UniProtKB/Swiss-Prot annotation:
Its EC number is 3.6.1.31. It is found in: Cytoplasm. Pathway: Amino-acid biosynthesis; L-histidine biosynthesis; L-histidine from 5-phospho-alpha-D-ribose 1-diphosphate: step 2/9. The lineage of its organism: Bacteria, Bacillati, Bacillota, Bacilli, Bacillales. It comes from Bacillus cereus (strain AH187). Keywords: Amino-acid biosynthesis, ATP-binding, Cytoplasm, Histidine biosynthesis, Hydrolase, Nucleotide-binding. Belongs to the PRA-PH family. One of its GO terms (molecular function) is ATP binding. InterPro entries: HisE, PRib-ATP_PPHydrolase-like. One of its GO terms (cellular component) is cytoplasm. This is Phosphoribosyl-ATP pyrophosphatase. PANTHER family: HISTIDINE BIOSYNTHESIS BIFUNCTIONAL PROTEIN, HISTIDINE BIOSYNTHESIS BIFUNCTIONAL PROTEIN HISIE. It is an enzyme of class 3 (hydrolase). One of its GO terms (biological process) is L-histidine biosynthetic process.
Length: 107
């Protein structure tokens, strides 16, 4: 049985291959990468607001929106979930130290 993430990603890829005129996913693909990236930015802002408001129910919903739009971006760039899982697996269990990260100089 496939998990919800796999099913969602497969649906997104299917919309890319076989567009439906009333599909929001198809709308995003038709507008291109800039629109997809704009939506990811908007949804990330909504995640921040929900978190700052301590609204966990809204936070879950907004996180799903971020993930959906990131999946659309992955499909747009022809990156598979397997590619993402391989990277997660590669990183899993590795020590990461604060000193290993570059400092953020400006925001």
């Amino acid at each position: 049985m496939k998990n919800a993430f796999t099913l969602l990603f497969e649906t997104i890829k299917e919309r890319k291959r076989n567009p439906l005129s009333e599909s929001y996913t198809n709308y995003l693909f038709s507008k291109g990468e800039d629109k997809i990236l704009k939506k990811i930015g908007e949804e990330c802002t909504e995640v921040i607001i929900a978190s700052k408001n301590n609204d966990n129910e809204e936070l879950v919903k907004e996180m799903v929106d971020v993930m959906y739009h990131c999946f659309v971006l992955l499909a747009e760039k022809n990156i598979s979930l397997e590619d993402i899982m391989e990277e997660v697996t590669e990183r899993n269990g590795k020590l990461s130290r604060v000193g290993d990260r570059r400092e953020i100089d400006t925001l």
